[in-house]
Regions:
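Amphipathic helical hotspot of TIR/SEFIR-family domains
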Residues: 304
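Short, solvent-exposed mixed-charge patches
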Residues: 446-448
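Hydrophobic alpha-helical segments, especially transmembrane helices
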Residues: 11-13, 94
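Sec-dependent N-terminal signal peptides
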Residues: 13-22
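Short, Lys/Arg-enriched N-terminal segments with co-localized hydrophobic residues
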Residues: 1-8
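Active-site mouth of glycoside hydrolases
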Residues: 35-301, 309-335, 340-443
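C-terminal motif of bacterial Sec signal peptides marking the signal peptidase cleavage site
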Residues: 25-26
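Ser/Thr/Pro/Gly-rich low-complexity linker/stalk segments immediately outside membranes or between
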Residues: 30-33
């Protein structure tokens, strides 16, 4: 039962997570009428007054491609957006930008916020350009504003800016020292206020290509507080919840139009505390329930045993999802599985490696979204991790100048990403066709 499942998470999987330091590892827009913004009504997303269900992707590096700096590639950006749209993918989860210094191992570059309140204008330009190009293709974009993990700065960078000692690097110094360090973000008022200033700057921005305020841009699906926000200790849980609530209220004070989301992994992002998971999603400013699912990272399936443990991974995935659907039902809010992934066969990274188990795992989740649409259910969408498209990474360990492929700099390139010639890419195309053809309750069956 679900109570026993939560107990299992606490007693068995959380210690593994603490030891391993698991992380991850969110045309037609001229009309500014309220209906062109996605909103929530009675537990459903509505777009143009119709229920909105989607199968989307993570594409955190899109704004970097949009820049005119040395790391940008507007030609590739256009091709990737077109390739995604061709596969029915029109919901993108994107990082606003990285924080801090360059030259840090396991961290992405280039850097948007180079010092508190100081920004690389080429990357702001790239963000504006990316948003315009997404809007031209009728895409919706989740913009997450910071990160609890080291790969883009986030918590640890704000702590250093607030005067704390140099942050440990998980891949070098170990995950436990990093976890202990970033647990200092939630109680650090100075670090939190610098982040709040960043929120004010980005949410208050006007796009230089469209001359439209971000707060008035229907292409934004939701503002997201953080990628995988965590308290990082039981002692921080109360203050963590208050921080989520206060940040959501800040965003709402700046933008009355868009949805707001947490970016949470769900239970595993809340110290395996069901009440905390529900509490951070219960704030009236928070529009929907987030969760992330990482069966390999969470050791539901392990290297050398992927085949034997695959059914276990699928079953635990279903149970984890059901726990969050229960929360959503109590809150009467939709659910988005905004990150999920599975390794290539034999946990290899090379392009061309078969994805037999990944495809089977994806099919389970994609079918759940399609089935939910048929029932008018609370599971409204998912974003797979992540789109690599035409990328050809030159190294397993990312180096600046290598193609971005959605696997962040702290992970092997090719680990979870989906290339345009993977069988997974066609699976996604087929799933979106089936989703589009699936009638809502009370509708006649759509033409296939």
């Amino acid at each position: 039962n679900k109570k026993n499942f939560t107990t299992t998470m606490k007693t068995k999987l959380l210690p593994l997570m603490l030891l391993a330091g698991i992380a991850l590892s969110g045309c037609g827009t001229a009309d500014t009428a309220a209906d062109s913004f996605v909103r929530v009504e009675n537990g459903q997303f509505l777009l143009n007054d119709k229920p909105y269900y989607f199968i989307g992707t993570n594409f955190w590096y899109g704004p970097i491609l949009g820049s005119q700096g040395p790391d940008g590639d507007r030609g590739r950006l256009a091709r990737e957006l077109d390739a995604l749209r061709d596969r029915g993918v029109t919901n993108l989860r994107v990082l606003v930008g990285a924080d801090g210094e360059e030259g840090v191992p396991c961290k992405i570059e280039p850097i948007l916020q180079t010092a508190p309140g100081e920004y690389d204008d080429a990357l702001l330009d790239g963000l504006d350009y990316f948003m315009r190009e997404a809007a031209r293709r009728d895409m919706k974009v989740v913009l997450y504003l910071t990160n609890s993990w080291e790969w883009s700065g986030g918590y640890s960078q704000y702590l250093m800016w607030a005067g704390e000692e140099k942050a440990p690097i998980p891949g070098i110094d170990g995950w436990n020292p990093f976890r202990e360090y970033v647990a200092g973000f939630i109680p650090n008022e100075r670090a939190r206020e610098m982040f709040a200033d960043h929120v004010r700057f980005i949410v208050g921005r006007t796009n230089r290509y469209t001359n439209r305020k971000y707060s008035e841009d229907p292409a934004i699906f939701s503002w997201q507080i953080c990628n995988e926000p965590r308290a990082f200790s039981d002692e921080n849980k109360e203050e963590f919840a208050r921080w989520i609530g206060s940040t959501a209220r800040l965003i709402r004070s700046l933008d009355p139009n868009h949805m707001i989301s947490t970016g949470s992994e769900g239970l595993f992002g809340c110290e395996v505390d069901t009440l905390l998971t529900e509490r951070i999603h219960a704030f009236p400013e928070i529009s929907y329930v987030n969760l992330h699912i990482w069966p390999y990272n969470w050791q539901w399936a392990t290297a050398g045993h992927l085949d034997e443990e695959f059914d276990n991974a699928r079953q635990l995935t279903r149970e984890y999802l059901e726990c969050h659907l229960d929360i959503a039902e109590r809150l009467n809010k939709p659910v988005v599985v905004e990150e999920f992934g599975f390794p290539r066969d034999s946990v290899r990274f090379d392009r061309g490696t078969p994805t037999r188990l990944r495809d089977a795992y994806y099919t389970d989740l994609l079918d759940r979204v399609i089935g939910s649409k048929a029932e008018g259910g609370l599971l409204a969408g998912c974003n797979f991790w992540g789109w690599a498209g035409e990328a050809r990474p030159a190294h397993h360990n990312w180096q600046r100048g290598d193609d971005f492929c959605c696997d962040p700099a702290h992970e092997p390139q090719g680990f979870y990403c989906v290339y345009d010639d993977d069988t997974t890419a066609e699976l996604i195309r087929d799933a979106n066709r089936r989703l589009e053809a699936t009638p809502l309750p009370g509708e006649a069956t759509k033409a296939q």
